[in-house]
Amino acid sequence: VPIAGLTSKKYADELRKGISLDAVGSKIPAGNPLPFGSGGTSHLSVIDKNGNIVALTQTINYFFGSGVLVPGTGILLNNEMDDLNPKPGTSNSIEPKKRPLSSMSPTIMLKDGKPFLSVGSPGATRIITALTQIIVNVVDFRMNIQDAIDSPRIHCMTDTIFMESSIPKDVQAALAAKGHKLTVRGPVDLYFGGAQAV
């Protein structure tokens, strides 16, 4: 049961579009809550009082993984193998003894040889760009970790720049004027990762 999707305000907003207060409605088709869920990747960061540090990103890949439960254990197997490319001849093609490409990037940073930051995020291929922006915000712009995580993000791996709508309008206009294709998403959008850090 996709609880996160079913209880999502965005999913409720989608369903609400089919309801009219001005006329008798027709039959409303069942919705699809899966796109409104949080997926199957999570991250946690921990530092204890002794300075021991953990950055852990885990995934079952997408929602219920492979859909296979190990009998008697409650353990759900992932479907990470679908991250391999079915086309032969690429660096990520299906082959024996091969692990699929993954963007998971649990990160521990040291300063003067001591733990200084543990950070990671879900978000598929957007994990790398999300973490890069967060780390640059902390290291180069000297933001505290919460401000670094809360700052608006972009993602660009194709000819389109995806960005949160909270990127300043003048920046959006300048990028468009240079010929970039822009896709603007919500102001705080989990599409760009849901980073967690200490």
Q: Where is each model-derived feature located?
A:
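Short Pro/Gly-enriched beta-strand edge/turn motifs at strand-loop
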Residues: A23-N32, N85-I94, G179-L182
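Active-site rim segments in enzyme catalytic domains, especially the processed small/beta chain
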Residues: N52-L117, F141, I145
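Short Gly/Pro-enriched turn/cap motifs at secondary-structure boundaries
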Residues: P33-G37, E95-L101, G186-L190
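Internal maturation/activation junctions in enzymes
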Residues: V1-T59, G72-T73, E80, G186
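Short, well-structured alpha-helical segments that form the helix of a local strand-helix-strand
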Residues: I145-H155
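Short beta-strand scaffold segments in enzyme catalytic cores
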Residues: S42-V46, P106-I108, G194-V198
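N-terminal leader/propeptide and maturation segments of large enzyme subunits in energy/redox metabolism
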Residues: V1-P29, N137, F141, I145, ...
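Alpha-helical support elements that line or immediately flank enzyme active sites
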Residues: S121-M143
